[in-house]
């Protein structure tokens, strides 16, 4: 059963300006080490960071909190499976809120899609509760 849906659309230029203005202060505040390593290797660095930023916003909306209630940017991280498929890993308050959303006997599955078409980046998150027996 679906227990949360979130989406976000962001202007890549806004993220590029934040990186130019604040540099590591911005990237270290909002992104995990894995996200920074992946984005810094990209030719389109700003687009890579923007997609991850949009994913965090979408995830916070799917959790029903936004970036509030103790949920911080780095509590939500975009990681890629060996196939390249992006997924979200939650920690801290985000993980606790997700756990509180789950019906008894269920485990979470977070589905994520991210895309960009300059000057926009977009993310969709669906949080699903799956029976533990599956």
Curated annotation (Swiss-Prot):
Keywords attached to this entry: Cytoplasm, Fatty acid biosynthesis, Fatty acid metabolism, Lipid biosynthesis, Lipid metabolism, Magnesium, Metal-binding, Transferase
One GO-annotated biological process of the protein: fatty acid biosynthetic process
UniProt-listed Enzyme Commission number(s): 2.7.8.7
UniProt: Mg(2+) binding residues: 8, 57
Primary localization class, coarse: cytoplasm
Keyword Lipid biosynthesis in record: yes
Co-factor requirement: Mg(2+)
Subcellular location: Cytoplasm
Keyword flag Cytoplasm: yes
Stated role: Transfers the 4'-phosphopantetheine moiety from coenzyme A to a Ser of acyl-carrier-protein.
Matches recorded under HAMAP family: AcpS
The name this protein goes by in its record: Holo-[acyl-carrier-protein] synthase
């Amino acid at each position: 059963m679906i227990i949360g849906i979130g989406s976000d659309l962001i202007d890549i230029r806004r993220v590029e300006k934040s990186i130019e203005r604040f540099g590591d202060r911005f990237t270290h505040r909002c992104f995990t080490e894995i996200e920074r390593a992946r984005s810094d290797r990209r030719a389109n660095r700003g687009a890579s960071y923007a997609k991850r930023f949009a994913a965090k916003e979408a995830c916070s909306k799917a959790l029903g909190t936004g970036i509030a209630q103790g949920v911080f940017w780095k509590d939500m991280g975009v990681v890629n499976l060996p196939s390249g498929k992006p997924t979200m890993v939650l920690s801290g308050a985000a993980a606790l809120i997700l756990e509180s959303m789950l019906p008894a006997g269920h485990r979470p599955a977070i589905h994520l899609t991210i895309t960009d078409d300059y000057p926009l980046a977009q993310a969709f998150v669906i949080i699903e509760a799956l029976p533990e027996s599956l």
